[in-house]
Regions:
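TPR alpha-solenoid repeat register
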Residues: 91, 125-126, 132, 175, ...
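Long, contiguous interaction/recruitment modules in multidomain scaffold/adaptor proteins
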Residues: 1-46, 105
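Alpha-helical segment of the N-proximal tetratricopeptide repeat
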Residues: 40-84
Length: 212
């Protein structure tokens, strides 16, 4: 066997060894990434649960001072959950709810915008997406004041969200009532009446404030 053939065989064996070692390393690397992802997800879930518990206590507490303190602690836990898993929309929604409870509506809107934007929104079920859209519409309407372009913009944004809610959840009576209120603000009396009638079929108590 000549020197050239020996050299070719040596190179072939070396190449095969490199491929073998590389293929063996792939599962190990994948496992390492999966382990890191699972740790991040577990940590995010832990902070999310703590935050949800704090927000629940904030809503139930009779003392305004304690309630706000608990809501701010819920925001802090939500931030930790977001840092651990930025791709999960749930902590962003929790943060928005806690901020809204604390009276910080514009930051709450920004958190909901982030939760409802891709790719984060992919983690939401249709019902969760509908809930988040409904909350965003509620905040938009709570911020409505005065007249002019700003009023029109917020009402239009709320209408868009509420129409999306009803696509995901057609029997959501609260969304129908809010949509009717938006139509009234736009001066669309007949459309508002139609939506209120639909809401009445779902739950008459939802439109008791609209009577008269």
């Amino acid at each position: 066997m000549g020197a050239t053939e020996l050299a070719v065989q040596a190179l072939t064996l070396a190449f095969a060894l490199i491929i073998f070692l590389y293929l063996r390393s792939i599962p190990r690397q994948a496992l390492s990434r999966l382990r890191h992802l699972r740790q991040s997800t577990t940590e995010s879930h832990r902070h999310f649960v703590r935050g949800a518990q704090l927000l629940s206590r904030a809503r139930a507490h009779s003392s305004p001072y304690t309630s706000l303190a608990l809501a701010r602690s819920a925001v802090a836990e939500a931030d930790l959950a977001i840092a651990a898993d930025p791709r999960d929309a749930a902590p962003l929604i929790l943060k928005a709810l806690a901020l809204d409870h604390d009276g910080h509506r514009l930051p709450a809107l920004r958190a909901l915008d982030a939760a409802l934007s891709p790719p984060t929104s992919k983690s939401l079920s249709d019902r969760d997406r509908a809930d988040a859209l409904l909350k965003r519409a509620e905040i938009q309407l709570a911020l409505v004041g005065g007249r002019g372009r700003q009023l029109k913009r917020r009402v239009d944004l709320a209408i868009g969200d509420l129409e999306d809610v009803l696509r995901f959840w057609p029997e959501n009576g609260k969304a129908k009532v809010l949509l009717g209120e938006c139509y009234e603000k736009k001066g669309w009396k007949e459309e508002a009446k139609g939506v209120f009638m639909e809401a009445l079929k779902v739950d008459g108590s939802l439109i008791s404030t609209q009577e008269g």
